[in-house]
């Protein structure tokens, strides 16, 4: 039995940091474990220009704890009106590493998202031309489609036409949750990758209803059946270079999670690598964690691997029940419970 695991310092390829006082409270959790992170642009207002991304990046760097080595990899929010010129400027910046596709209304702060991807054809052509990755929230928002089917329908109605029309466009299918998505990414032609969250590796949709409604397990895309969880575990632990770590850690104040109309998102930045270690250990695949967490992501994005390391030890510890979040608190996933791995 392995009691200590040292890996190349990992990166988080899907992260929400928020802004203001909340940003200052959460960014240190990520920077403690990860060398870099892809920063989601769904602020209010959304980050749609290079100038906005530069300003947000500066706020992130200013909020880091003293002595921290961490690089925020910025993204832009794709809208119906994003122009090819915006893409070229972003690529030339050197600090913007992707453009995020949110179907309008799909998740938190996605109201300004794309209503019809066909409106973005010239912009997608520019992205393909300059090598700018498209980061996709892969769910349709048609209210007639069952919420548990929205990812599979997205593959058929959006992803397949997108790949046909822009075969050289680098696409990241973010936070995949289904067997369909795992198989699609594994078998697709061209530059396609996928991030997988710790919570989708560890839990199925039953976790939402154990003894009552469990709002801190509510995220989008929602947790799926056990057959889908097992398929995600198989993909993550396969060693296939198209699958890599993306926490989708999404902090929300306790009051808006424990609410009649609660927000979607699980906060895992505080204990991300500990959760992934549990998932990989449960699958008897700790030897595959380094590739998934530290190697596949930078290789896909064409970035150098980190020079440092992260060590995890087998050690029981209790996760805080709540942590500060601006003027309020937030509840991390499994808050107050025991974990069996600890990053040092």
Swiss-Prot record:
How the cofactor is bound: the record states:
Binds 2 Zn(2+) ions per subunit.
Q: Which domain of life is it from?
A: Bacteria
Q: Where in the chain are disulfide-linked cysteines found?
A: none
An example Gene Ontology CC term for this record: cytosol
Q: Which GO terms describe its molecular function?
A: dihydroorotase activity; zinc ion binding
- In this chain, where does the modification N6-carboxylysine occur? 100
Write down a Pfam family by its short name.
Answer: Amidohydro_1
Specify which residues bind Zn(2+) 2 according to the UniProt entry for this protein. Answer: 100, 137, 175
Q: Which reaction does this enzyme catalyse, per its entry?
A: (S)-dihydroorotate + H2O = N-carbamoyl-L-aspartate + H(+)
Q: What is its EC number?
A: 3.5.2.3
| PANTHER family in the cross-refs | DIHYDROOROTASE
What the record says about family reads: Belongs to the metallo-dependent hydrolases superfamily. DHOase family. Class II DHOase subfamily.
Q: State how it assembles.
A: Homodimer.
- Give the protein's recorded name: Dihydroorotase
Q: Give the organism the record lists.
A: Ralstonia pickettii (strain 12J)
